[in-house]
Amino acid sequence: MPVKLSVNLNAVAMLRNRRDLPWPSVTALGRIALGAGAHGLTVHPRPDQRHIRFSDLPHIRALIDDEFPDREFNIEGYPSEDFLRLVEETQPEQVTLVPDDPSQATSDHGWQFQEHERFLAAAVGRLKRRGFRVSLFADPDADEAALAVAKAVGADRVELYTGPYGACYDDAEKAAKELRKLEKTAKTAQGLGLAVNAGHDLTVANLPALVEHVPSLAEVSIGHALTADALEYGMAETVRRYLSACEA
């Protein structure tokens, strides 16, 4: 099956929040992305609401329910009590749990699964009882023991952190090394019964090689690069380009 594309709207929200104005509209840009073929929308609401605001979530939920009922809403975040309540209110199809400190600019490392096993088991169990698919953020070189914990706590998927790959893409030797890590980790996860997502610093240029090396990839979530490209090419054309890259 082709890799699914979930468009992360955080960068759109950050641009909006530079001024006390209602535009660019997160919902309107989400509608364009879905209309161009994106399979879903992703947001990462942080406690300080510096990009996505809590008030955005019901509007995105309604957009998908009313106009694109075959698409998915993915909410990322650290599983604090406030976050879990927000998710339960919004009812996304997928919840991606990340080990971020609230002050971080972006997610930049995966879970230490053995260290946080009990904590994750409680959070994942709570979400699964509500019927959500749960993905856990994982380092690109997470080993079998770590991934086995992800499976044991009830996760459906892991999202592989692709930041190191994106950072060295212009260096063929380093990029090849990172791809081998991702390929190995994805195969291990799949062998344990975990589906595999990926995200962070993915671009229309580096996506095809990732898809080639990780054929089991279920979904990528892309925000910063896609939004930057949308400033030049428009959201609809940019989404079409990323969808083509997912099929390369």
UniProtKB/Swiss-Prot annotation:
* Record keywords: Cytoplasm, Pyridoxine biosynthesis, Transferase
Pfam families xrefs: PdxJ
Keyword Cytoplasm in record? yes
EC number, as in UniProt: 2.6.99.2
> Does the keyword Nucleus feature in the UniProt annotation?
no
What this protein catalyses is:
3-amino-2-oxopropyl phosphate + 1-deoxy-D-xylulose 5-phosphate = pyridoxine 5'-phosphate + phosphate + 2 H2O + H(+)
Major location category of this protein: cytoplasm
Per UniProt, subcellular location reads as: Cytoplasm
At the top level, the lineage of the source is: Bacteria
Active site positions, chain numbering: 44, 76, 200
Pathways involved? Cofactor biosynthesis; pyridoxine 5'-phosphate biosynthesis; pyridoxine 5'-phosphate from D-erythrose 4-phosphate: step 5/5
GO MF entry, a single one: pyridoxine 5'-phosphate synthase activity
GO CC, sorted alphabetically, is: cytosol
Which of this chain's residues are annotated to bind 3-amino-2-oxopropyl phosphate?
8, 19, 201, 223-224
| Gene Ontology biological process terms from the UniProt entry | pyridoxine biosynthetic process
Feature type site, description Transition state stabilizer: 159
Query: By its UniProt entry, which InterPro entries does this protein fall under?
Result: Aldolase_TIM, PyrdxlP_synth_PdxJ, Pyridoxine-5'_phos_synth
Q: What class of enzyme is it?
A: transferase
Per UniProt, where does 1-deoxy-D-xylulose 5-phosphate bind?
A: 46, 51, 106
What does the subunit comment say?
Homooctamer; tetramer of dimers.
Family of the protein in this entry: Belongs to the PNP synthase family.
| PANTHER family, sorted | PYRIDOXINE 5'-PHOSPHATE SYNTHASE
User: Entry's NCBIfam families?
Assistant: pdxJ (TIGR00559), PRK05265.1-4 (NF003626)
| Job description of the protein | Catalyzes the complicated ring closure reaction between the two acyclic compounds 1-deoxy-D-xylulose-5-phosphate (DXP) and 3-amino-2-oxopropyl phosphate (1-amino-acetone-3-phosphate or AAP) to form pyridoxine 5'-phosphate (PNP) and inorganic phosphate.
Concerning HAMAP family, the annotation shows: PdxJ
Q: What is this protein called?
A: Pyridoxine 5'-phosphate synthase
The species this protein was found in? Chelativorans sp. (strain BNC1)
